[in-house]
Amino acid sequence: MKFKESKSIYLQIADRICDEILQGQYPEEERIPSVREYAGTVEVNANTVVRTYDYLQGLEIIYNKRGIGYFVSTGAKERIITLRKDTFLHEDLPEFFRQLKTLEISMDEIDKMLSLIHISEPTRLRRIS
């Protein structure tokens, strides 16, 4: 796994595990790889994966059955989506709008970009309620 300098490795691994849960690779109430197995997969020290698993346990995305291993919590997908939406709406989106303003990017330019990535007019204008 290639890591970015701008974010802690254990958080990048947590994001990867959450992606894998969302994609159905690890269903709810099913076991995920052991710390050592996952450390080997992402090529990091096992202590980094321990920190990742502790972090995900704190978010109630996974839980530990002592002596058996780590399992995906019931409702983990919904929890991940909720956390990611919150981060997007309260951190990523405000930063995006600050950048638009700083770089003086017009709505016409945004509209052109949306057309390039094939987001149709009705989708763009629809309000989410």
Per-range role (PLM):
Residues 1-6:
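N-terminal intrinsically disordered/low-complexity leader segments
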Residues 26, 30, 58-67, 71-74:
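Beta-hairpin "wing" of winged helix-turn-helix
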Residues 76-101:
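Conserved segment of winged-helix/HTH DNA-binding domains
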Residues 10, 34, 70-85:
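Short, cationic-aromatic polyanion-contact patches
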